[in-house]
Amino acid sequence: MALTPLRVAGVPEHFNLPWHLGIENGAFRKVGIELEWQTVPQGTGAMCDLLRKGETDLAILVTDGAVRDILNGNPSRIVSSYVDSPLNWGVYVGVGTALHKPEDLVGLPFAISRYNSGSHLIAMNYARSLGWMPKKENFIVVNDLFGAEERMRTDEPMAFLWEVATTSPWAEQGLFRKVDEFRPPWPCFMVVATEQALKEKGAEVHRALAVVRQQAALLKTRADAAELIAQRQVISLPAAKEWLREVRWNMDGAVNNDALFNVATALRELGLIDGSPTKEELVRRLVV
């Protein structure tokens, strides 16, 4: 059977382990798909660019980043929820700073991977939860987690938000100090496909999603799942166990339309999208 190539982009984090397991055990090939994985450490903003340029067929994006970019013209659609549990963002500062509590961060810069990335959008939501609205000069682009480490070693007064388990080695080694956690009230990841990929490879997209759901379900039942995650992601076993206990991969492809509407409302209040579409109009523009 001839294999259909399918390009998928995602961050190098434990959430995406089911994709890698499916590649390694040949599960995608068994359904006629040659899955080509592209790791994108810069995150959602960079993957939105790949989708716009047609350089990937699918991408695993944080929900608010997916909603914002599609509403701002990205020729792609949400095809499925991927992780239904909310993303737990750690709020970090340099260990040599005098910053110790959320209130200390009001008015300070945020380090972000890039503009319109997950770290950028969530920093704006977090700042709003503290009662202030950042401006462009409140953001420092650091490209990725390692760039954040380098910048925060200077002990400049700034904050950086990234997923808690991923950043746990930095916190445990005393490279970052965590002063808060922030969980937005919506699912953390969506699977987004280009309209061209849906037109040309729609059946393969849905077969691939069926495979990855099966791999996620199998991973959740493995006795050694936490050990595997800790080894593959180079995080501590306690951090892996805590993350595995909380994560909920989507198992039926359903998209929470109410959650998408809440995301769009938050983005509009932050000035990141225009217009006030109804929930029905919003879903029609976002979801296939």
Predicted regions and their residues:
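Solvent-exposed, acidic/flexible segments
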Residues: P12, T44, N116, H120, ...
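Pocket-lining segment of extracytoplasmic ligand-binding domains
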Residues: F146-I229
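Conserved C-terminal helix/tail region of periplasmic/extracytoplasmic solute-binding proteins
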Residues: R268-V288
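Residue-level preference for well-ordered alpha-helical positions
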Residues: A127-R128, A171, A230, R268
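Short, glycine-/small- and polar/acidic-enriched structural segments
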Residues: A2-W132, F139-V142, M158-V164, L175-R183
